[in-house]
Amino acid sequence: MSQKQPYPPGEFQWAFLLPKYWKIWIAIMFLMLLAVLPWAIQWRLAHGLAALCWRLLKSRRKTTLRNLELCFPEWSPAEVEAQAKQVFVDMMLGVFETLNAWYCPKWFKGRHSIEGLEHITNAKAQGKGVLLLGTHSTLLDAGGYICAQYFEPDVVYRPQNNPLLDMLIYRCRATIYQHQIDHDDMRSLIRRLKDGGAIWYSPDQDFGLKQGVMAPFFGVPAATVTAHRRLLKISKAVAIPLYFYRYGDVRNPQYKVLIEPIVENMPSEDEIDDAIRVNQIIEAQLRIAPTQWMWFHRRFKTRAEGYDKIY
């Protein structure tokens, strides 16, 4: 859950030095130290933490298992459990990868590549803003950092409840993204697109039917956000799918950014058809690296009248 902060994002407040924030400062310093550890140690820590989370976070574990069971019916129960455990591993690896992107970005040198950059370059050459249709990848800001080595990305964000944590994350992300735009600030999003920005936008979570429609996601009806239609229509921007993922030996990983051609006729006159198309794009992306997505979120929590509960 997030909320608006009563001060400009990223701004330091003297109140952050009060004792109630000391635990967060200590935690941040500890995380900064983790970022300078060799990847071999980070990799082992990630596996250990993933195993611990698997045991302790029962609700997240059940949600992950249920989601994978629904979305990959071709998997056996044993495969579902194995892949669910890997989701937790990839999430922990993503934490270390994000710390590296924030505090030790040189670690990524020589480890990344991009395919399809011309789709963004051509759109911007025509004066178009670009809405990058992505996902909530477990790579987190590591993916954003890799994108920033090839073009200037903006990002949509949700403010954190804790004001100190919000400031620290905002400042770390400021080293990666050109602009960070509150997900509720439609005017700024539209303005940035009109100015020719390339905004990473992830329409892959359940925010209810006030902000979307029911559309199949891996064959399961899911509340699907439709705000991108308004953004594209008003700004005259184009929608371009973007996906990034880790591959190869996890002990010496490589990273790839995959950019696809412009989604034609988006938005169309049919809201549900657009939602279906976006979900199909996301499905295709997730099949590349199925465990590098946040399956522990309740993607199917909203059930319209007549639909059975999932969880």
Residue ranges and their predicted role:
Residues 56, 111-112, 135, 161, ...:
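Residues that cap or flank secondary-structure elements
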Residues 62, 159-163, 221-225:
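Active-site metal-coordination segments of metallo-dependent hydrolases
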Residues 126-184, 209-212:
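Catalytic core of membrane glycerolipid acyltransferases/transacylases, capturing the structured
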